[in-house]
Amino acid sequence: MKMKILLIGGGGREHAIAEGIKESKHNPILYALMAKKNPGIAALCEDFLLEKETEVEKIVEYAKARNIEMAFVGPEAPLAAGVADALWEAGIPVVGPKKACAVIEFDKAWARNFMKKYGIEGCPAYEVFTEEAPAHAFIEKLGDVAVKPSGLTGGKGVKVMGDQLPDLKAAKDYTSELLEKGPVVIEERFIGEEFTLQAFVDGKNLAFFPAVQDHKRAYEGDLGPNTGGMGSYTDAGEILPFMLAGDIEQAKKIMQHTVTALHEETGTGYQGVLYGQFILTASGPKVVEFNARFGDPEAMNVIPLIETDFTEIMSAVVKSTLDSLPVKFSRKATVCKYAVPAGYPDNPEKDSEVLVGDVGEASVYYASVYEKEGKIYTTGSRAVAVVGRAETIDAAEKIAQNALENIQGKLFFRKDIGTASLIQKRIDHMKELRGGLSQKQ
C-alpha cells in the first residue's frame, strides 16, 4: 500500500517539500492543504483543499476523509495554531512540533527566557518589556541594540542599531510603536555574519543539514528594507566559505542542548524541523532566533541535496528512530534566488502575470503566486524561486541567474546573491572580526 501524506502550506518551501516527498522510491500519494492554489504543489498532488492553513478542525476533517497516514506542516502559523497537536490526537503522526515546542518560534520573549533558564549557549544580554520607560532606559544602558516584537512577524519585525535604526532615538521610537501591540524583546546587537543551521529532529536525535546563508535585505549590496529572504546559498560541504569547522560544531551543540531542554521544559519531544538562525561573531556563533520549521528560502537549498529517501526520514522523525537512519547529502553547492513583485516588500504589485520561460538546469519553486485559468499571478509577496546546483557556488550562481533572466513579469531580484564578490566580502568581514585567522581551517 502506498502511504498517503498530507502537506500543509502553499509557499516555495512547501513546493520543495512536496518535491522531496514525491521523489521517494515508495511512491507516496500526496495531498495538500493551502490557502491559494500553488501551481507547483498542485501538479504533484493527487488532491488538494484550498483552505486557511490555521483552520485546525477543517484540516483534521480533510485528513480523516482522505485517510492520511502522515502529515508535514510547512509554515509557522499552523504550528502556532496547534495543527500538529490536533492531527496527533486524531491518530495522524506529524513532522512539525506540537504547540508546546513551537512556542520557541512564535514567542521571542519565551524563547530568550527559556535559553537563559537552561544555560543555552549563545544567548545575548536581553530584557523583555511591556512598558515604555524601563524599555527606553535599557536601550540607553546597552547602547547597541536589536529590537524585536515578541510574536510572529514573517521575518520582518526585527530592527537593529546602525542598520534600520540610525540612533538611540530611532530605537526608542520603534520600541514605543511595538509596545502598542504587545511585549518587546530588547537585546544586545551582535556583530558578525549570519548563517542558518537546520536539522530534522525526532524528539532527541538531530540530523543536520549543511549551513546556509540567507539575504534578508531587499536590494543589492544588502540595502533596503527587511524581507522574508531574497535568496540563499550553500557550499559543497557542511560549512560556508567564511566559517571554520569548529563554528558549525558549536552551533550543533547549541541546537542539541535546545532540543534536550525543550523536552525537559515541556514534557513533549520536539518532532519536526528545527531552524537555528546564528550570527558568527569573533567569539563564535550566537543565537539570533530559533524557528520551528524549514527556512524559506533555505529549504530550497537543502532539500534537493538529500540523498536519503525523504519519506523514510519523515517516518524516522515521527517514530523517534533518526539515530538508526543515516541522512546523507550530495556534496554540491546551491544558490537560490527569488523573483519578487515590483515594489516589494512595502508597495508590491499584485495580481500581475508571471511567465516562466526556459530555466535550463535550474529548479523552479512557486511561492506566493496563484493559478487562474492556466495563468500564474503574483499575490504581493515573493513570487518564484530558482535554484542552481553545481560543484561550486560560482557555477550554481550562474545557473540560477540564467534562469531568472527567463522569468518575465513586473518582478525584480538580487543579482549579487552567490556571486564571488559578495562572498569575498563575507570572508573579509569574518577575517577582520577574528583578527586575520584564515578561513575553512
Swiss-Prot record:
Protein name as catalogued: Phosphoribosylamine--glycine ligase
Positions of ATP binding: 139-196
Transmembrane portions of the chain: none
Cofactor annotation comment: Binds 2 magnesium or manganese ions per subunit.
Enzyme class: ligase
Binding site for Mg(2+) 2: 289, 291
Residues annotated as binding Mn(2+) 1: 277, 289
Gene Ontology biological-process entries: 'de novo' IMP biosynthetic process; purine nucleobase biosynthetic process
Cofactor: Mg(2+); Mn(2+)
Pathway(s): Purine metabolism; IMP biosynthesis via de novo pathway; N(1)-(5-phospho-D-ribosyl)glycinamide from 5-phospho-alpha-D-ribose 1-diphosphate: step 2/2
Alphabetical list of Pfam families matching this protein: GARS_A, GARS_C, GARS_N
InterPro entries: ATP-grasp (IPR011761), ATP_grasp_subdomain_1 (IPR013815), PreATP-grasp_dom_sf (IPR016185), PRibGlycinamid_synth_ATP-grasp (IPR020561), PRibGlycinamide_synth (IPR000115), PRibGlycinamide_synth_C-dom (IPR020560), PRibGlycinamide_synth_C_sf (IPR037123), PRibGlycinamide_synth_CS (IPR020559)
Zinc found in the keyword field: no
Reaction(s) the record says it catalyses: 5-phospho-beta-D-ribosylamine + glycine + ATP = N(1)-(5-phospho-beta-D-ribosyl)glycinamide + ADP + phosphate + H(+)
Domain ATP-grasp stretches: 112-319
Enzyme Commission number, as recorded: 6.3.4.13
One annotated GO molecular function: phosphoribosylamine-glycine ligase activity
Residues that bind Mg(2+) 1: 277, 289
Entry keyword annotation includes Transferase: no
